[in-house]
Amino acid sequence: TSKISTTYEEEGRQSKIQPRAFVITRSGPTSRSSSYSARQSYGSRSSITPGVYQQLSSSGITDFRGTREKEKREMQNLNERLAGYIEKVHFLDAQVKKLEAENEALRNRKSESLQPIRDAYENELAQARKVIDELSSTKGVSEAKVAGLQDEIASLRELIGTYENQSKDYRKKIESLGNQIGEYEGELHTLRIRCGSLEDENAKVRELLDKIQDQNRRLRADLDTETSAHIEADCLAQTKTEECEFYKDLLDQLELLKPEPMQIKGMDYAEFWKSELSKCVRDIQSAYDEKIDIIQQDIEAKYSSQINSLRSGNVKDGMQLQHVQEEVKKLRTQAGEKNAAYAELAAKFASLQAERDAIGRQCSELERELEELRIKYNQDIGDLSNELSAVLAQLQTLTDVKITMELEIACYRKLLEGEESRVGLRSLVEQAIGVQGRGTASLKDTIQQS
């Protein structure tokens, strides 16, 4: 292609626009019922009819001046707009001359041979069509591959949803097991508190039993002491009885061994000693018997009272001891049952913890595998998306090149055909732009459908 440059000299061109004259008629203030007319040409020429100044007052003069200034500004604006229109007309005339020169240059180039250019463009078009066909086949394979990958992604998403539902079920089961473990721990804590209270009561009962046993031991020691004292008293009484018997035997022997009584005049000494000795022995015996009786009565009363108290205390202590033994036995039975239940709960708790740990490990393993699969398929999707974007970019580039070539070929074809209708460059450009817009729209529709 060749570029033709034209210059436009505004000074040597005669403008066909003639100066225009404007006639403006203004009505004066209504209060004065006066009117005036102004005639202004392009040279700003004005005239006022005589006799008008005589009818105007000072306020009318002020209004007239303001109106006059306003009219002047309007005329200046109109003159500026007119000058702008004139400049536009000059520019359009220059453009027309430039286009006419370019058209004349193109008509003069008809004799030149454009066959090599046409062949080159046809070869490029053939190569572009071949590349487009190859890209279309590659696009079909890529679309099939993408569809397969999308199906695989959908199946993997379903599998991920299944795993997520299973993990939710496992989490709910873990929460329920944790709540059950908490209930068991609360019950176990209650049982421990109950066992502690029962152990405290058992310790108190043991202390009471120890006190009762100490009291029994003290009472038994007192009983042994009283029994030994009673035995000693019996032994003492037996000794005194034997002593009395000894004294009786001694007296009898003395009576047998005594000499013949001396007869004192007026007094029988045998009878005297016999009566005195018998009296002394009787006094001693009576005093000893009284003392023995008093001691025996005291000992018997004390012994009987102690025996009665011991018997009543033993009965009461025996009942209390039996009750305490029954209570201790019952508490031991309950403690054994609670220990068995505690052992069972501890075993169950350990099994539940082991099951929870196993489920947690399984969930973490599934989550890890799921995350790895997700990362892998996201990478595959990203790679395929990048590849598809690159293919679409190449296809769009080739399509743009094809459309550009077709437009250039169409332009050269019209130039070579030599139309005599003298179509301007503007119509050719508009037609080319319309073809390019239609090609771009068809390419966009094709890309969206693919």
Swiss-Prot record:
Residues 107-120 are annotated as: Linker 1. Residues 1-50 are annotated as: Disordered. Keywords: Acetylation, Coiled coil, Cytoplasm, Intermediate filament. One of its GO terms (cellular component) is nuclear envelope. It comes from the Eukaryota. Residues 1-74 are annotated as: Head. Residues 424-450 are annotated as: Tail. It is found in: Cytoplasm. Residues 259-275 are annotated as: Linker 12. Gene3D superfamilies: 1.20.5.170, Vasodilator-stimulated phosphoprotein. The modification N-acetylthreonine is found at T1. Belongs to the intermediate filament family. Can form homomers. Epithelial intermediate filament protein. This is Non-neuronal cytoplasmic intermediate filament protein B. It comes from Helix pomatia (Roman snail).
